[in-house]
A protein has these predicted regions:
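Ferredoxin-like iron-sulfur electron-transfer modules
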Residues: 1-20, 191, 225-236
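Iron-sulfur cluster-binding cysteine motifs and their immediate structural context
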Residues: 1-12, 23-41, 258-259
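Cysteine-centered iron-sulfur cluster-binding motifs in ferredoxin-type domains/subunits
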Residues: 12-31, 64-67, 142, 241-248
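Low-complexity, highly charged intrinsically disordered N-terminal segments
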Residues: 64, 69-91
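Long, compositionally biased charged/polar accessory segments in the mid-to-C-terminal portions
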Residues: 79-82, 188-367
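Glycine-rich phosphate-binding "P-loop"
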Residues: 93-123
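A short alpha->loop->secondary-structure connector
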Residues: 104-105, 152-164
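Short, flexible loop segments at boundaries between secondary-structure elements
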Residues: 158-181
Length: 367
């Protein structure tokens, strides 16, 4: 995989060693999909078991919503398996790793709003399955479909694939540029980021938390994620998603996942203020696994869960300023203004209301 001019990782064939066997084309999900995105709808889930889930422990605070993926992976490790998920590496790049260490689960918690680098994880998952190990893989719909296609005829009985409900994947180049701009602004090296930190105000108003090393001193910067942080807001405004995300062919049941998990964008009394997960069992194997997990798991109506998660079957519309943004961002030297220039008026209105303590109150009234 190599980055294209917009920074997205794309398949790349090394023609110096290519023997023209055609195997890469045969396993490419994009070239071989039979999915018809026109058939995806809320009703794609009517025959699937759906659940509201949350952990009843402090570990839920570290997760983006109810902690379902954390619980699923922890259970796999406890039974001698390995897990594959996304973490921040030492350079604050999003990468997938495969591990049997429980300590790595904390690195996999919470959202990373950038396309992750898969590396050799597909090959490693395949090798573990051939050795009879239990494996959990968690990724975006396209990453999950890619794994399933890569495995081919390999016995995947011991694999549980979990696909996250996906808005789309931002460019690694954009994240790198934003990181550089912020490091220059705060005169330090970014060493930690949590784009969905819940410790201050809970799930309803998550913060984007950055920690910088400024000459040996830690500097923490927190902004309300979808209200006051330009990077997260512009991601949610679909400004710098991959082109294919605007007509994703891996929505609904088009990715082959055993389980689909994500936010429940509403509230239930039992969950308190720390969030709840929407979980869909897409296969009998996925449903059986869900039932083995600890925590609060309540059978729910698929309409209730899917109606607040339209990204289950819909793709985002392309932001009309996308092309202009990528022209700016590819310059050698950029500033924060190259991002804030694209913020719509509603960003500043939301930010002002949040600063006045009125945003959540108004949101409740409108609901």
């Amino acid at each position: 995989m190599k980055p294209n001019k917009e920074g997205f990782f794309m398949p790349n064939v090394n023609m110096d060693v290519c023997i023209k066997c055609g195997k890469c084309e045969k396993v490419c999900p994009h070239l071989n999909t039979t999915s018809n995105i026109a058939t995806y709808s809320l009703e794609s889930f009517k025959d699937k078991s759906s659940y509201l889930y949350f952990l009843d422990s402090k570990e839920r605070k570290e997760s983006a919503s109810g902690g379902f993926v954390f619980a699923a992976m922890k259970s796999c490790l406890a039974n001698g398996g390995v897990v594959c998920g996304c973490v921040w590496d030492e350079n604050m790049k999003a990468v997938h790793i495969i591990t049997d260490k429980e300590g790595d689960l904390q690195r996999m918690q919470s959202s990373k709003y950038v396309q992750s680098e898969i590396g050799r994880c597909y090959s490693e998952v395949k090798a573990y399955l051939k050795r009879g190990r239990n494996v959990i893989f968690c990724g975006t719909p396209c990453q999950t479909a890619g794994l399933k296609s890569f495995l081919g005829r390999v016995d995947a009985t011991n694999l549980i694939s979990i696909c996250v409900i996906c808005h789309g994947t931002p460019s690694p180049l954009v994240w790198e540029k934003w990181k550089q701009v912020q490091e220059h602004k705060y005169k330090g090296k970014l060493e930690y980021v949590n784009m969905r930190d819940k410790h201050k105000k809970g799930y309803a108003t998550t913060c984007c938390k950055y920690v910088y090393d400024v000459n040996g001193t830690k500097k923490t910067v927190e902004r309300a994620a979808y209200i006051a942080d330009p990077y997260v807001f512009l991601f949610s405004d679909s400004l710098y998603l991959r082109n294919s995300c605007y007509h994703c062919q891996y929505k609904a049941d088009g990715n082959g996942a055993d389980i689909i998990a994500g936010d429940f964008h509403a509230s239930i009394n039992e969950a308190g203020k720390w969030g709840c997960s929407s979980v869909f069992a897409m296969t009998p194997k996925g449903e059986d696994y869900i039932k083995t997990l600890p925590g609060y798991c309540m059978v729910s109506d698929y309409r209730k869960l899917a109606s607040v998660n339209p990204m289950l079957w819909k793709s985002e519309k392309m932001n009309p300023q996308r092309e202009e943004f990528f022209e700016k961002i590819q310059k050698d030297i950029i500033s924060e203004k190259d991002f804030t220039h694209f913020l719509p008026r509603k960003f500043y209105v939301k930010k002002m209301l949040e600063q006045m303590g009125l945003f959540n109150m108004i949101r409740k009234i409108l609901k």
